[in-house]
């Protein structure tokens, strides 16, 4: 977990509340995603860690973002720059996404498999996870050849390891004990 999570939470909450109030949640998530990517740029990272005045830093950051930020998004950047918190933007985005998922009663579910799964397999996993979690789910699929076969499903703190690799690791643990 990043060192900026605690710092990011109030900014994310304020942005989310504003976005809901103005019915622009998608737009705000897009703006935050873009701004978070800008902070990851090598040259921008140097500026963020430099000794620029907050106003100069904010205006430079806004200039780089261009049309991607509306007036309200620019105001958020100015406030964060004033408090020397622009490095927390990736965590603000993450917290914003969590707030959105909670408000929409959805959960992000990560599905890792050795090969791409069919639509039928994905819909079965989705239905099973919706039943288990009692909410809508959004599947994020990853391919990891080290899984060998089967799937690993992660939803929050819950992990369901149905992979061959997981079974082999459990078998090795049993044999060693």
Curated annotation (Swiss-Prot):
Its main location: membrane. It is a peripheral membrane protein. It is found in: Cell inner membrane. Transmembrane segments: none annotated. GO terms for cellular component: plasma membrane; proton-transporting ATP synthase complex. GO terms for molecular function: proton-transporting ATP synthase activity, rotational mechanism. F(1)F(0) ATP synthase produces ATP from ADP in the presence of a proton or sodium gradient. F-type ATPases consist of two structural domains, F(1) containing the extramembraneous catalytic core and F(0) containing the membrane proton channel, linked together by a central stalk and a peripheral stalk. During catalysis, ATP synthesis in the catalytic domain of F(1) is coupled via a rotary mechanism of the central stalk subunits to proton translocation. F-type ATPases have 2 components, F(1) - the catalytic core - and F(0) - the membrane proton channel. F(1) has five subunits: alpha(3), beta(3), gamma(1), delta(1), epsilon(1). F(0) has three main subunits: a(1), b(2) and c(10-14). The alpha and beta chains form an alternating ring which encloses part of the gamma chain. F(1) is attached to F(0) by a central stalk formed by the gamma and epsilon chains, while a peripheral stalk is formed by the delta and b chains. NCBIfam families: ATP_synt_delta, PRK05758.2-2, PRK05758.2-5. This is ATP synthase subunit delta. It comes from Salmonella arizonae (strain ATCC BAA-731 / CDC346-86 / RSK2980).
């Amino acid at each position: 977990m990043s060192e900026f999570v605690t710092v990011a939470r109030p900014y994310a909450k304020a942005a989310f509340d504003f976005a809901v109030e103005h019915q622009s949640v998608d737009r705000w998530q897009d703006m935050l995603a873009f701004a978070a990517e800008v902070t990851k740029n090598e040259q921008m990272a140097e500026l963020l860690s430099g000794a620029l005045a907050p106003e100069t830093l904010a205006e430079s950051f806004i200039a780089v973002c261009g049309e991607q930020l509306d007036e309200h998004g620019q105001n958020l950047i100015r406030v964060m720059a004033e408090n020397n918190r622009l490095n927390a933007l990736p965590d603000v985005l993450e917290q914003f996404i969590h707030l959105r998922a909670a408000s929409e009663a959805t959960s992000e579910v990560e599905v890792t498999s050795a090969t791409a799964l069919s639509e039928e397999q994905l819909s079965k996993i989705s239905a099973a996870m919706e039943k288990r979690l009692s909410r809508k789910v959004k599947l994020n699929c990853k391919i990891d050849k080290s899984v060998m076969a089967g799937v690993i499903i992660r939803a929050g703190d819950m992990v369901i390891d149905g992979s061959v690799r997981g079974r082999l690791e459990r078998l090795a643990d049993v044999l060693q004990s």
